[in-house]
C-alpha cells in the first residue's frame, strides 16, 4: 500500500498500491528497466520499502518471522538456481523446510506433499534425475513444485519464462494456471511476452519507469494505442490479434 521502491535510498517508483487475491493472477508488464523487478523484490522483502507498507494475509511483512513468511509466500526469481548434487525430488523437498525444524527431517506427511506437488506439475517422470541434468523447462516445473510444497497463499515470480522456448513457456503457464485454480493461490508475476500476459492474467499492471501507469483487465490494457504508448513505439506497432510487437520499416 502506497509503496515507494528503489535502491540505496533513492526512489524509482512511488505510490505503488496493488492487491493480489487468491485464485487470481496479477501480471506486471512494461519496458525493460521500467521497475518491474524492483517492485517484486520490494514485495518479497529482498529490497526495503522506502515508504509505504507490504501486507501479507492482513499483517505487515515486517511483523512476521521469516519462517512465517515462507509458509505463506513462495518465490521464483529470475536468477538461475544451481543446487549441486541434488535430485529434482531433493529440490522439491526443500520446500518443506519451513515446516520441518532445524534438522530438516521430512515426516511421512511431508513426503506425501512432495509427491503430490511433483504430480501436480507433471514432474514425477524425472523426479529422481539430477536437477543439473534436466532441461530449463523441467527445472521451472521443479521450482513450481517446490513452491507448492510450501503450501503458500501467494507465489511471486519474476519473468519465469525467460530461459524457455515457446513450447515450455506455454506448458509452464498452463501448469501455473492449473495450480492457481486447484490450490486457490494468489500469483504476482512479471512477464515481457505480451501474448502470454494477455492469455494468463486476470489483472495487468503497467509499469512505466517512474510510476504505475495503468491497472486493468487484459481487455482494457492490450489495445494498439495504449501498448504503443507504454512501450514508446516509434517505428513499430502492437498487433491486437496476436498480442505481438511488430517492427514497421
Where do the model's predicted regions map?
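Helix-to-loop junction immediately C-terminal to a conserved catalytic motif
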Residues: 44
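Conserved ABC transporter NBD signature motif
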Residues: 52-60, 69
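Conserved ABC ATPase "signature" region
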Residues: 93, 108-126
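Conserved catalytic motifs of ABC-family nucleotide-binding domains
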Residues: 151
Amino acid at each position: 500500500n502506497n509503496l515507494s521502491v528503489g535502491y540505496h535510498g533513492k526512489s524509482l517508483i512511488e505510490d505503488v498500491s496493488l492487491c493480489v487475491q487468491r485464485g487470481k493472477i496479477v501480471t506486471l508488464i512494461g519496458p525493460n528497466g521500467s521497475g518491474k523487478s524492483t517492485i517484486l523484490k520490494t514485495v518479497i522483502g529482498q529490497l526495503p520499502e522506502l515508504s509505504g507498507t507490504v501486507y501479507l494475509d492482513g499483517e505487515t511483512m515486517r511483523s512476521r518471522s521469516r519462517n512465517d513468511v515462507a509458509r505463506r509466500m513462495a518465490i521464483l526469481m529470475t536468477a538461475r538456481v544451481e543446487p549441486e548434487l541434488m535430485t529434482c525430488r531433493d529440490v522439491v523437498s526443500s520446500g518443506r523446510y519451513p515446516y520441518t525444524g532445524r534438522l530438516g527431517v521430512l515426516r511421512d506427511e511431508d513426503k506425501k506433499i512432495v509427491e503430490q506437488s511433483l504430480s501436480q506439475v507433471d514432474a514425477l517422470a524425472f523426479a529422481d534425475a539430477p536437477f543439473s541434468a534436466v532441461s530449463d523447462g523441467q527445472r521451472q516445473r521443479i521450482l513450481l513444485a517446490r513452491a507448492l510444497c510450501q503450501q503458500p497463499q501467494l507465489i511471486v515470480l519474476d519473468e519465469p519464462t525467460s530461459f524457455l522456448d515457446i513450447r515450455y513457456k506455454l506448458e509452464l503457464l498452463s501448469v501455473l494456471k492449473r495450480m492457481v485454480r486447484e490450490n486457490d493461490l494468489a500469483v504476482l508475476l512479471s512477464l515481457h511476452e505480451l501474448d502470454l500476459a494477455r492469455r494468463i492474467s486476470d489483472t495487468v499492471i503497467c509499469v512505466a519507469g517512474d510510476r504505475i501507469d495503468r491497472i486493468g483487465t487484459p481487455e482494457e490494457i492490450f489495445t494498439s494505442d495504449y501498448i504503443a504508448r507504454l512501450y514508446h513505439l516509434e517505428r513499430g506497432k502492437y498487433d491486437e490479434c496476436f498480442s505481438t510487437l511488430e517492427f514497421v520499416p
